[in-house]
Amino acid sequence: MKIAVSGAGSWGTTLAVLLANKGHEVLLWAHRPEFAAALESDRENIRYLKGVRFPENLHVVSSLRDAVISSEMVVTAVPSQALRETVAMFSDCSLDGKIIVNVSKGIELKSGKRMSEVLLEVLPTLHASQVATLSGPSHAEEVSKGQPTTVVASSVSMGTAEIVQEAFHTGMFRVYVNTDIIGVELAGAVKNIIAIAAGITEGVGFGDNAKAAIITRGLAEMSRLCIRLGADPHTVSGLSGIGDLVVTCLSRHSRNRYVGEQIGAGRSLDDIVSQMNMVAEGVLTSKAVFELSRSVGVEMPITQAVYEMLFEHKPVQEAILDLMNREPKKEHY
């Protein structure tokens, strides 16, 4: 199969290499022509994935439109807030028979839409059955080294999900399938916010009890939002829910956890973001999900606390006290 991958960050590059190693012909698109030329010349992504060599059947291109036209499958691996402008580059192309696989984890800030909703809005000829999302606990740093990883491919069409499964599945990259794309995308977005909160507990010096509380109650927030928006409750207990939540909250590779640690240690958000090499999706997603939760009437106190600390400059200790001193509730509501 010929597959285009849009986005040459660590995850896009990792998936491009994985797909090429499986035998697919892969076109990896980089936004800046000079970066694309450097990747093609170096045969590795020194900036984002140093040490991982490109197979011969992986080529780096600077024209996304041409790559899409010539491919059967398109993987979108750009930051969630850049998805709309990226796919607009090929919105006039015929997408008949093509499958679009989103691997970004976020909610669009200006619209409150999930990634598959953005794709369907920007690409008017695309049908929902042509769209899939690949998600789960899958840090690029481990996948690129061939370490065991499990993810889920989700689409409203089981047939499409199974095509994606076949395209990506390897001996060390196990792909499951489901048809709950709503739940998979919402869970993938919310877990980044909860990871920031988990990082904050580290940064202020709290122990494992606090982190476990954040993960567990964060899962409850994720579940409430997913159910309110029509997702399958079982999805939250799967790879895209608890699986990705745990790894993002605990892993040393987690950019969102890192942001939280630094916030907890007293650094400003602007200072943290300005010194990061890659995007922490949970930052802007916290604002998008907070606004979404209010619009649909779902209580998400941890998400609200993260939003207030990041965007309203609420002191960390004050936010923690407010969380702990909320009115007592039933565990499940």
Curated annotation (Swiss-Prot):
Primary subcellular site in the record, as a coarse category: cytoplasm
Report which superkingdom the organism of origin falls in: Bacteria
The reply to whether 4Fe-4S figures as a keyword in the UniProt entry is no
* GO biological process assignments: carbohydrate metabolic process; glycerol-3-phosphate biosynthetic process; glycerol-3-phosphate catabolic process; glycerophospholipid metabolic process; phospholipid biosynthetic process
Q: In which pathway does it act?
A: Membrane lipid metabolism; glycerophospholipid metabolism
* The enzyme's E.C. designation: 1.1.1.94
Q: Where in the cell is it found?
A: Cytoplasm
Q: Name one Pfam family in it.
A: NAD_Gly3P_dh_C
Q: Which UniProt keywords apply?
A: Cytoplasm, Lipid biosynthesis, Lipid metabolism, NAD, NADP, Nucleotide-binding, Oxidoreductase, Phospholipid biosynthesis, Phospholipid metabolism
Q: Does the keyword Lipid biosynthesis apply?
A: yes
Residues that, per the record, bind NADPH: 10-11, 31-32, 105, 140, 255, 279, 281
- Catalytic positions are 191
Query: GO cellular-component terms in the record?
Result: cytosol
Q: Which NCBIfam families match?
A: PRK00094.1-2 (NF000940), PRK00094.1-3 (NF000941), PRK00094.1-4 (NF000942)
Regarding protein family, the annotation reads: Belongs to the NAD-dependent glycerol-3-phosphate dehydrogenase family.
User: What job does this protein perform?
Assistant: Catalyzes the reduction of the glycolytic intermediate dihydroxyacetone phosphate (DHAP) to sn-glycerol 3-phosphate (G3P), the key precursor for phospholipid synthesis.
Protein name, per record: Glycerol-3-phosphate dehydrogenase [NAD(P)+]
What organism is this sequence from?
Chlorobium phaeobacteroides (strain DSM 266 / SMG 266 / 2430)
What is the taxonomic lineage of the source species?
Bacteria, Pseudomonadati, Chlorobiota, Chlorobiia, Chlorobiales
